Amino acid sequence: NPYDIQSVNVLKDAAAAAIYGARAANGIIVVTTKNATKKGKVDIDFSANLTVYENKNMDYADNFYMTPAQQVDTEAKYMEYYLTRDNALDNMKKSITEGSQVTPIYYDYYQFASGKISRQELDSRLAKYRTNNYARDFADNVYHTRLLQQYNLALRNSSDVSSNNLVVNYKHDNAELINNDLDWLTAYYKGSFELAKWLKATVSVNGLYSDQKSLGYNANYRGSFDPWTLPAYMPFYNEDGSIRKTYYWFTGNEYWDVPNGFHDLGTDPVSELKNNVKTNTRQNMRYMADLEFRIIKGLTANAMFSYEIDNVEEQTHANEKSLTSRVIRNAYTTVDAAGRVKYNTPENGGMLQTTNTKGKYYTLRGQLNYSNTFFKKHDVVAIAGLEFRETKLNGTKSLVLGYDEQLQN
């Protein structure tokens, strides 16, 4: 918790090893947390921060891309040349009917070359393309202003024999993309107690809970969520105002006839952000206890024990309409010589992938520390200790195809 930091120091090499043992031989970073400033009173600290991030600059020229008008002019000039080549029309038809990625201008020139539209209609379409701005419309629908909210409450008190610190921190991040966010809550308690002149005890408990929602794995991420990979002049909307589907790389194009039994792989980014969602939930608890025995002047002994539990559940739900589910169904669909279609995965439903990991960790350490100065100029520092550590991590992973969330209720 950055709000609870008093100071940060770096100890290198011998200085670190002298205090923290051989495992710190390469140096350590010491983070000192805050304590109460006045004895007998309770310090209350509260802070609230709101960070507003600047919206992404989606201007083509500012990002070193051709503007929509420049792209239209350049591609149109190329297509005028391309039509003079041998077999141009046949090659264009093959690209379209076989599902290759083609641009709107490519398809318009194919229609013009095959006599389906006139030169006047072609010029009219090109003029309309020059007024489009795909990246701008994409940003208006997919991005929103990123807001980061942070709240911190700290209660601290101290006396001659004890000190107590309780710190609670909450963070919410809307993550810029629609249907994405992060909630993060931590609570920390630390207490130090002088049980006797020769004994000091320190205990601490730290709890963390986080819940994050983001876009699940998308095989066509660049084609759906990277506007710079698509023509700048491409319409973001259909004529009826709905969002136009995009096609990229292996997903075909909007002009071909999808083979019987297979699913069209066009996607629009707004729907995909709702149809394919990954959630990550984490719960972490850490407990620590430390006893310091003051044996004689300059000689102390420490016994420390810490135990940590970390549970993480990651779940990706791509529903039936998501691109991921459609890609899976197409990939495992076969057609025999007679044209019969066979589905090797469920025909309906989506995908649910779940990963659970559970970590348990403990550290037990005993250490003797000696530090003294003789004759006001000879410093003697020595440590001897023994440490036991265990790290245990296990988990499960599952994949369900044909998953329908409505049937689970």
Predicted segments, located by residue:
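Short acidic/polar hinge/loop motifs at secondary-structure boundaries
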Residues: N1-K12
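Transmembrane beta-barrel domains of outer membrane proteins
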Residues: L11, T32-K34, A154-S158, V167, ...
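N-terminal periplasmic accessory domains that precede
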Residues: A18, A24-A48, Y151-L153
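A generic beta-sheet turn/junction motif
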Residues: A24, T37, N157-V161, Y170
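Surface-exposed loop/interface segments of Gram-negative outer-membrane beta-barrel transport/assembly proteins
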Residues: K38-N133, A175-N180, T186, K190-N284, ...
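Outer-membrane beta-barrel initiation region
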Residues: N141-T145, L155-S159
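Transmembrane beta-strand segments that form the barrel wall of outer-membrane beta-barrel proteins
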Residues: V168-N174
